[in-house]
């Protein structure tokens, strides 16, 4: 399975380090941002394959980041947040998040969710390729 590039958007250094250490140990490529504005700029400039996004960012709320990114990109967004209330999850998913993982989380669950997202991306790419071949 191809290792996609992941944008990690997390302002809490220990959590960001846990995520990036896990990604590095499993040969994922990644870039990081500690702010929502920085995340939007990273998506525009680096076009990551997957975004891991915290909601509680210091400048703009993660749900607003989702809305901004969704206005021009379909990149899969997995929220990783301490916000565990149903309304927080619903707001993020309705804004365009593809998945929601609550903190604290296990690295095994994070990796499993990344694998699921990768499978979806590969399926979409395969279908797009097949459509192009038959046109």
Annotate each language-model stretch with its function:
Residues 54, 81:
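Active-site residues of response regulator receiver
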Residues 16, 58, 85, 103:
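The feature encodes the CheY-like receiver
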Residues 27-36, 42-43:
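Short hydrophobic/Thr-rich beta-strand motif most characteristic of the beta2 strand and flanking loop
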Residues 10, 57:
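Conserved acidic carboxylate
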Residues 4-5, 118-135:
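Short, Lys/Arg-enriched segments at the junction into DNA-binding effector domains
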């Amino acid at each position: 399975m191809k290792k996609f590039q992941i944008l990690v958007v997390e302002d809490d250094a220990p959590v960001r380090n846990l995520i990036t250490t896990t990604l590095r140990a499993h040969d994922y490529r990644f870039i990081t941002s500690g702010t929502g504005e920085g995340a939007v700029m990273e998506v525009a400039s680096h076009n990551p394959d997957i975004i891991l996004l915290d909601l509680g960012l210091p400048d703009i709320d993660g749900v607003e980041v989702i809305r901004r990114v969704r206005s021009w990109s379909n990149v899969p967004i997995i929220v990783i947040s301490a916000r565990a209330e149903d309304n927080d999850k619903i707001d993020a998913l309705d804004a365009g998040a593809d998945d929601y993982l609550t903190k604290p989380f296990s690295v095994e669950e994070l990796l499993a969710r990344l694998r699921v997202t990768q499978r979806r991306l590969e399926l979409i790419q395969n279908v797009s390729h097949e459509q192009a071949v038959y046109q």
